[in-house]
Amino acid sequence: MPKTAFLILKSPQELDPTHTMKRFADSQDASAILVEDGVYHAMLARPAERLAKVAKDVLVSGDDLEARGFQASDLKMGRVVDYAGIVECIMERTDRTITV
């Protein structure tokens, strides 16, 4: 199965991306990239637990986290990256990108 980056833009209240992620990638081949309101998936316990089951790597946009008044210590999971880190994941470590 191809390595897939899932770009998650919406909050957990708007969307549970895990169903789509399971359909298109094995958890060992999936990376979740949380941007915009998608960063809330890494800050709330239940969404973070669900995401941990379907993605090997979870990247959280530091700029989007900061724009919402939060910091890395507020995360339940994942690691904060800058846009260069997001681009590197998409271009160098995955075969395709799916926006959910």
Predicted feature locations:
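Short, glycine-rich nucleotide/cofactor-binding loops
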Residues: 3-17, 35-41
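Short, solvent-exposed amphipathic alpha-helical segments in soluble enzyme
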Residues: 20-26, 48-50, 75
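Short, well-ordered alpha-helix to beta-strand connector turns
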Residues: 28, 55, 94-95
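Short internal beta-strands
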Residues: 30-36, 57-64
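C-terminal structural segments of small proteins and small subunits
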Residues: 70-100
